[in-house]
A protein has these predicted regions:
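Active-site palm subdomain of RNA-directed nucleic acid polymerases
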Residues: 177-189, 589-612
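N-terminal structured subdomain of primase-like DNA metabolism proteins
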Residues: 676-788
Length: 788
């Protein structure tokens, strides 16, 4: 039997900013009520003071299904069990409707999910506003006037109606024929994912607090210098339009301030004002440092562990995402800064950081030091090497490349590195004659051309300083393709099999043995690609449509995509299918490794892309033993050559113990002196003084369209054209347009500015809305290692 349930709560803590685990354990968090239904029975309600329902008194008789089980599990464990005497529910007796939907590539949000499944459940906008008012009750100190009991009773009635509807919607979506139960291997992964998220990983609180302090000082100093340099026109590093206008007024034509555009402009020897403006922008815009505040908020006050950091199936195809603390965005230490700089940052020794370059840039490179082991333990981090290059060669039987990986793994000889082997095949040279720049050529070609990409993919992968013409890049792409005939054929086989499956409705075996089996099938609605592991990737609403690029080309495959919380048509070509299959296989290798580590009694506390992190007592196991467990191939991948690397220590950060700082650009030294004037405590200019909390009118008047845009605060699912379903009237189609500084519904006519939305829709008080806008840290492109 199955129990479907939904809990409605209240707290002074923000669920979005602190996460379910911190939220549930906070003493101000409580329960209004919860609703539940057994199988197809009528929905019932429990309120504080009621006895424990009989069905909850013996939970092992049921499977408990909630929409987002992380929340219900946390509230049940921290509040229902501890305060109201409910017995614990074993994890084996729980399931998640949202995770099942994500596993089949349907939306996470229950309202949009029901719409995509054709179910007649819609969110009541008035009930949502009631929920927001009741979920963050004002304290007596903050309340400006007495609470109206009649309004509260009306809101509770609306919230109860919403809760009843949510239980019905969860039940209907969970049992939709389009959302089949997970296969046993994936059910095991789901349960392990819950255990790993509940275990969490320890946050390095002193390091995070030091990062936050540095960020505030540096950004305030940079903003002060910008203000002085622009004579008060630019007051913040986040004022992108003003910075571009100032640069373009001096003879340039910048359309963006991304890394590539800034580097290109600086390379053309601009005047000193432009150079300093852009250097200041670079200096202050480091997203990794801005994560310090977020990670501190998600860390448990009792043991400093960050729980609930990952969501299985949160990224395609079936991979994990980190939607709350965003731990997957912590940068690698590519600059190889020494570990001693972590201690320097914690000690506030900014002079030592400055010896190595821009302090914010240095701190960003060290950001993986934000995660650490608990006392007496170490973190052992193992990483599958070049896995997205190995898998295509294995799937397609590109034998020379499979052999190259095996030889490299056997010898460890860097001269035989597969990127060098690729360059040798491209350039038709002996591998021992490949120089370092040519090795980089092989790497760039591998990462850009491996999934059928061309010039555009090369530009995204290659370094900013790459100045090759499109013709040169095309020549390199052709050389890569000529060197990989089997992989090239595999692209076409995948796409052709998908088209045949859609046309005929018959399952198609992409390749016969000894190649790994891949089966593509179409059930009249969804296209599925079953990987060698037995797990399927789903493309809902698949159909063939005319080729949009070549009139005489093969038809495109159109499907519905749930990326970024939306549900909109997307197109797939052979590159898309190949990338999904390769990343899906890589995901399944990682998933199998997680189960092996747990079976060996080695607790996984974090994993990211192709990397696994375990936390063990010091001296309990060697790093090579851990690496050997990672490299054990599952039964379905016995012929896949696997290699990897390992490092260990108290910190997640991989860094040499010591090192010598690089030479500093004289211009950077001059800039340091200018900024240090302000860091040392020089009186800031009046226009740069931080606006005090509560000075609402002055603050709001200072906001431009590029500062704290409303789109960054909207929690409702947004369409590709910036619209959401209006929260003020019942309309299944998105009709409310979100702009940078205001919003307007073209259905009912409701409209307003940022503050209106935050207070009327997001449920914030005026003070909370002002604080959220002031705390906004800017939309900066998050830089990730391209091999990830």
């Amino acid at each position: 039997m199955i129990i479907y349930w939904d809990i409605e709560t209240y707290s002074q803590v923000s669920l979005k900013e602190r996460g379910a685990h911190v939220y549930a354990s906070d003493p101000t968090t409580g329960i209004h009520f919860f609703c539940w239904a057994i199988d197809d029975d009528e929905v019932q309600t429990w309120r504080p003071g009621d006895p424990v329902p009989a069905s909850f008194a013996d939970p092992t008789r049921y499977i408990f299904v909630s929409d987002n089980w992380e929340f219900e599990r946390a509230i049940h464990a921290q509040i229902l069990v501890k305060r109201y005497g409910f017995p614990p529910i074993p994890i084996e007796n729980q399931d998640c409707a949202q995770r099942r939907a994500l596993a089949h590539a349907f939306p996470a949000e229950v309202g949009l999910r029901c719409e995509s499944l054709g179910l007649p459940y819609r969110k009541d906008p008035e009930a949502r506003r009631a929920m927001l008012r009741l979920s963050r009750p004002q304290t007596a100190k903050k309340r400006k006037k007495p609470e109206d009991p009649a309004v509260r009773e009306r809101d509770l009635a609306l919230l109860h109606k919403r809760c009843l509807s949510d239980v019905a919607a969860t039940r209907a979506s969970y049992n939709s024929p389009r959302l089949q139960p997970l296969i046993p291997e994936e059910r095991a992964q789901l349960l392990l994912d819950a255990e790993i998220n509940g275990r969490g990983i320890r946050a390095n609180i002193p390091f995070l607090e030091a990062m936050r302090t540095l960020a505030v000082k540096e950004r305030n100093a940079v903003n002060a210098r910008l203000n002085e340099l622009s004579v008060g026109v630019i007051t913040s590093v986040d004022q992108v339009t003003r910075i571009k206008d100032a640069v373009n007024a001096r003879g340039h034509a910048m359309t963006s301030l991304n890394k590539r555009s800034v580097a290109a402009t600086l390379a053309h020897d601009p005047d000193e004002v432009v150079r300093e403006l852009l250097t200041l922008r670079q200096r202050g815009a480091y997203a990794s440092v801005r994560m310090a505040k977020r990670l501190l908020a998600f860390a448990d006050p009792n043991d400093s562990r960050i729980r609930g950091w990952g969501r299985i199936y949160g990224a395609g195809p079936g991979r994990w995402s980190s939607p709350g603390p965003q731990l997957h965005n912590l940068k690698r230490n590519d600059a190889e800064y020494p570990a001693s700089l972590v201690d320097a940052l914690i000690a506030g020794n900014y002079a030592e950081l400055a010896r190595w370059g821009n302090p914010l840039a240095v701190a960003a490179e060290l950001s993986r030091a934000a995660l650490c082991a608990k006392p007496g333990h170490i973190l052992i981090c193992v990483d599958l090497g070049a896995i997205e290059s190995r898998i295509p060669a294995w799937l397609s039987s590109e034998q020379w490349k499979v052999d190259a990986f095996r030889e490299y793994d056997r010898t460890g000889d860097e001269r035989l590195h597969p990127y060098r082997q690729t360059a040798a095949h491209m350039l038709q040279k002996d591998v021992l004659a490949i120089a370092k720049p040519e090795r980089q050529l092989g790497k760039a070609a591998e990462l850009s051309a491996g999934f059928g990409g061309s010039v555009g993919a090369w530009r995204r992968i290659a370094h900013d300083e790459d100045v090759r013409s499109d013709a040169e890049v095309l020549a390199f792409i052709k050389q890569w393709r000529d060197a990989h005939p089997a992989i090239r054929a595999f692209w076409r086989e995948l796409a052709q099999a998908a088209r045949v499956a859609i046309r005929t409705g018959r399952p198609i075996l992409v390749a016969a043995g000894p190649r790994p089996p891949i089966v593509i099938a179409f059930d009249g609605y969804a296209l599925t690609i079953t990987l060698p592991s037995g797990r399927a990737i789903t493309y809902p609403g698949a159909r063939l449509s005319p080729n949009t690029k070549f009139e005489d080309g093969d038809p495109d495959i159109e499907f519905f995509d749930n990326a970024r919380g939306q549900w909109k048509p997307a197109r797939a070509w052979f590159g898309t299918l190949t990338e999904n299959v390769v990343q899906g296989c890589a995901r399944d290798l990682l998933a199998a490794a997680l189960l092996r580590f747990e079976a060996h009694g080695l607790p996984v506390v974090f994993h990211c892309h192709d990397e696994v992190v375990i936390e063990v007592p010091e001296g309990s196991i060697t790093t090579m033993e851990v690496l050997a467990i990672l490299l054990e191939p599952p039964a379905w991948a016995m012929n896949l050559p696997l290699g990897g690397k390992v490092h260990s220590g108290r910190l997640y950060l991989e860094a040499p113990a010591t090192g010598e700082p690089p030479p500093i650009d004289p211009a950077e030294i001059d800039l340091d002196r200018a900024v240090d004037t302000f860091v040392a405590g020089a009186e800031p200019l009046p226009a740069t003084k931080e606006i005090e909390r509560g000075a609402e009118e002055d603050f709001l008047a200072s906001l431009g369209t590029n500062i704290a845009p409303l789109t960054d605060f909207v929690s409702l699912p947004m369409s590709s054209d910036g619209k959401v379903s209006c929260p003020f009237h019942d309309d299944p189609n998105p009709s409310c347009k979100i702009y940078a500084d205001h919003w307007r519904c073209f259905g009912c006519g409701e409209h307003g500015d940022r503050m209106d939305w935050l207070t009327r829709v997001e449920g914030m008080t005026k003070v909370e809305a002002i604080a959220a806008l002031q705390d906004w840290s800017g939309s900066v492109t998050i830089e990730q290692d391209v091999t990830s």
